[in-house]
Amino acid sequence: MPKLGILKSKSMFCVIYRSSKRDQTYLYVEKKDDFSRVPEELMKGFGQPQLAMILPLDGRKKLVNADIEKVKLALTEQGYYLQLPPPPEDLLKQHLSVMGQKTDDTNK
């Protein structure tokens, strides 16, 4: 009887680096210390990459602050994914909006 070879699928990992210049900005690449596919201008603005973690993407359904499908697609197509910080909350605007709604409700 012929032996059946076991097919090994290539696991997908990403290496995540924290920016030394920009708070809450992260760069995801496929291999540790391989920034060969990252544009030079992006690297200048990013600063010295600081290793944050190595993360397996296979079997994972989501990431905390990034869409996992977008990350996988970007890694495959361009070799990196840049995670920018969320936009700042405008607490004053939110407060005034809520206060305006309360005023409108009492004037009816």
Swiss-Prot record:
The lineage's top-level taxon is: Bacteria
Which source organism does the UniProt entry give? Shigella sonnei (strain Ss046)
InterPro entries, per database record = YcgL-like_sf (IPR038068), YcgL_dom (IPR027354)
Q: Give residue ranges for domain YcgL.
A: 12-96
Instruction: Supply the name of the protein.
Output: Protein YcgL
Gene3D superfamilies this protein is in? YcgL domain
